[in-house]
From Swiss-Prot:
Top-rank lineage group of the source organism: Bacteria
Protein name: UPF0340 protein SE_1711
Family indicated by similarity: Belongs to the UPF0340 family.
InterPro entries, sorted: Antibiotic_NAT-like, DUF436
SUPFAM superfamilies from the UniProt entry: TTHA0583/YokD-like
Record Pfam families: DUF436 (PF04260)
NCBIfam families tied to this protein: TIGR01440 family protein (TIGR01440)
Length: 174
């Protein structure tokens, strides 16, 4: 999947991935192969994407969280070691290709000790196929522009965040 590797290399060169940070991944493998979101799914595509992301975790120290589909309320699969009971609520569900999506299903199967949480707040994310990851990105969400606009047939959107600017016209920010 040349598009994916090109995107990840470009983001890596931009220092998008930082050690200890968590990045949310939303992915419609159906969209990647040119079908309507949620229609067919592909564990083969999920495996290829996951393995590329896993290598990036090793290379950069970033951690990935995997958003499920709307059938599980876009719940997020993470390693239990990253679970914070003060800011996250565990839910009882095991992602499945038809209720959770192929990538979150594959991630759940590959993780050492997976847990699914209802909601997470992270500073950045990659959305492959318009899966609507924005609900898991800190305010204020900011788009990141790259030369890669699609992974396969899926539109890709990258987001980061910045702190809110508060205080009105008299406030100073620098």
């Amino acid at each position: 999947m040349r598009d994916l590797q090109q995107l990840l290399d470009e983001l890596k060169d931009m220092s998008f991935f930082n050690p200890g940070e968590m990045c949310i991944i939303g992915c419609s493998t159906s969209e990647v192969i040119g079908k309507r979101i949620g229609s067919v799914g592909s564990m083969d595509v999920a495996k290829e994407i996951y393995e590329n992301l896993k290598q990036l975790e090793i290379d950069t120290g970033v951690t990935f969280a995997f958003q499920g589909c709307e059938h599980i309320n876009r719940a997020v699969t993470i390693e239990r070691a990253n679970f914070n009971p003060l800011t996250m609520e565990e839910v009882t569900v095991v992602p499945d290709v038809h209720a959770g999506g192929s990538l979150s299903t594959y991630a759940y199967q590959q993780m050492e000790d997976p847990i699914v949480v209802e909601h997470i707040t992270v500073s950045k994310g990659i959305d492959i196929g318009q899966t609507l990851i924005g609900m898991h990105i800190k305010h204020v969400c900011v788009p990141v522009r790259t030369s890669v606009k699609q992974i396969g047939e899926a539109i890709v959107t990258i987001a980061t965040s910045r702190p809110k600017k508060i205080g009105g016209e008299r406030a100073k920010y620098q």
